Amino acid sequence: PVMGVMGAFVFATQMINFTIPGTGASGHLCGGMLLSALLGPYAGFLTMIGVLLIQCLLSADGGLLALGCNIWNMAFYGCFIGALLIWKPMMRRGASKKKIVAASVLGCVLTLQLGAFSVTLETLASGITELPFQTFVAVMQPIHLAIGLVEGLITAAVLCFVYEARPELLWGTDESTQRQKARFSLKKTVAILAVLTVWI
């Protein structure tokens, strides 16, 4: 259920596009950091792939030919680079609102900068752009820096709300680790009781 709800939320936020003048491209919120912070990098990655697939099939946003690039630029960077290099190390010794805000903003800015730079490299490799590489980079990076800051603040607001209401839902924190251990202990206890019942 959480994957479906979060996927729908990210799908809706990605519909907000910002035209980048002179490039033929547009920028938008991604949601990779938000997904990975709540679902973990692997489930978040799969959810993001589902969002991108629905977009290209139903609304022709990106298209099938660009699906692989979009998965790399948004799903991979957001759900693995942001989650494993920034979110998890910062939450290792416990979560707090300050840490959540810092990790959200830093993660979103970094992953969107990586994604924007990858777009310029992919466009250059395709050979269909009329803009020089330096000009394309000079336009893409500042705009995605602003988008990253906005997305970081939105992500932080959502995650701070979750932290207050259900802190165990945050991936990579002490609370989520304790929840996983509790689930494992429960399964272990049930398994032992089942074996004893059969044995008796």
Locate predicted features.
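Hydrophobic transmembrane alpha-helices that form the pore/transport pathway of multi-pass ion
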Residues: 29-43, 47, 97-103
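Hydrophobic core segments of alpha-helical transmembrane domains in multi-pass membrane transport
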Residues: 9-14, 80-83, 108-120, 155-163, ...
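Hydrophobic transmembrane alpha-helices
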Residues: 1-35
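Alpha-helical transmembrane segments and their cytosolic interface
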Residues: 1, 135-199
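Hydrophobic alpha-helical transmembrane segments
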Residues: 1-5, 45-49, 72, 101-106, ...
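Interfacial aromatic-anchored transmembrane helix boundaries in multi-pass membrane proteins
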Residues: 18-24, 51-80
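Short helix-perturbing small/polar motifs within transmembrane alpha-helices
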Residues: 74-115, 119
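Membrane-helix interface motif
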Residues: 120-129
